[in-house]
């Protein structure tokens, strides 16, 4: 689940930065 959580966090950060 850690990988999924990390991916979700990265996607979230990407959306925020965008």
Curated annotation (Swiss-Prot):
Alanine amide found at: 18
Top-level division of the source organism's lineage: Eukaryota
Primary subcellular site in the record, as a coarse category: secreted
Record keywords, A-Z: Amidation, Antibiotic, Antimicrobial, Disulfide bond, Secreted
Subcellular location, record wording: Secreted
Biological process (GO), any one: defense response to bacterium
GO CC terms in record: extracellular region
InterPro entries to which the protein is assigned, alphabetical: Antimicrobial13
Subunit structure: Heterodimer with subunit B; disulfide-linked.
Purpose: Antimicrobial activity against S.aureus and P.aeruginosa, possibly by attacking the bacterial cell membrane.
Name by which UniProt lists this protein: Halocidin subunit A
Source species: Halocynthia aurantium (Sea peach)
